[in-house]
Amino acid sequence: MRKAKIVDTIGPATESLEGITSLVEAGMDVARLNRSHGTPEDHLKVYNNLRAAAKATGRNVAALVDLQGPKIRCGWFKKNADGEDKVQLTEGQEFVITTDDIEGDEHITSTTFKGLPGDCHAGDPILIDDGKVRLEVTKVEGNNVYTKVVVAGPVSSHKGINLPGVAVSLPALTEKDEADLRWAIRTGADIIAMSFVRFATDIDRAHEIMDEEGRRIPVVAKIEKPQALENLEEIVKAFDGIMVARGDMAVECPLEEVPLATKRCIELARQYAKPVIVATEVLGSMVNSPVPTRAEASDCANAILDGADATMTSNETAVGKYPAVTVSTMSRISSFATEHGFDRIPELKNLDMSSTGAVSSAAVDLADKLNAKAIVAYTQTGSTVHRVSRERPATPIYGITNNEHTYHWLALSWGTESFLLDEDYHDKSRKDLMVFTDKILKDAGKVTDGDKIVVLSSAQGEHQPGRTDSIYVHTVGACD
């Protein structure tokens, strides 16, 4: 089994049932629905297609809804002579960004961020379209921010605006994000990704909305702002996982800092047993090519060897020409990296060692010493499985739960295959639990009689999450 997981962005190239099925068959573990594009109706169709494809293929695939976040964008531009809503900026010219609602031209554009004049000062850099166009603020007057074009280039409607080094006064969740979050909860999403997280407290409003809606969903923090890197450890502790969003990170931070920042994100996420996704241009050239560059193949493999739980595609599968080929290529690279470079994955240091963490770590040691065929964890929230997974054991991990959303959440956990039950297991005696475990794994073809397995669970009758306190070394078939 491939150990590291694959997250794929769904878009026009793959949103049909056939398109999504091709990604699932190629190896997709988590489907990303990007709420920066499309309507709720569009994404509902994608969600339904995803569930249908997973059912038809018999694979566990999670639905991740990625909230747009407080992204600053240009407004609309007037159409040019070619009928395109695009302008060409030239070096040295003056260009104005205004909070007034106007149609833009080569001299001025509106912006979605009404607080821009209050946050900008003379000398501040402003980047458009991921830094392809660079401006420098010359003055601020009323609703207008006056700039000089430093790096020229084309600008079109709704291109992103970044203010590197500027602490912008934006909320963690916009009105659109709150509406999209409620939609995701009601639709049945398994994972939420929050964009432009800056502080650990950014998760608070999301939790308030979830409580109002009656269901908590794991929230992954996208690390892309300098403030997020400054507050990284507290963010990792507060959120359920993180995504290293290297695109905006490379615009907001000096480019040369991104590789080491990525490694630090992976290390901290593993330390606190939180799944970590490495994203942005992992196999970027495959948007237009059936093969990646050598550098991209190395980037993908090195993310896994650094200890990431998953790598992610963006444009490659959303609008690319070879989406299924991209996923199968990523799967091959990932599989080879873990099969032949397993001992290169760093050992963990300074573990966050709760009682559950200590039990999980002991289970990994036992499985290794006994050459066990499996580590089995019964779980309600997925926490125990993540604590086993962070140690990157060579032994296969099987998470067993009767919670459907936890079942899908475990699709993101390194080295883990999960089983969904339709019955409760908390009140089973030790013997009954072992017989029950044998049947699940034998029916799935994972073990045979005589194999040793290590089983993690809570005490009989214990229903509280986070109470894993028992390790059983069991020989399959011994309790029959």
Enumerate the language-model features and the residues they cover.
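Non-catalytic helical/linker scaffolds that mediate oligomerization, partner binding
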Residues: 1-480
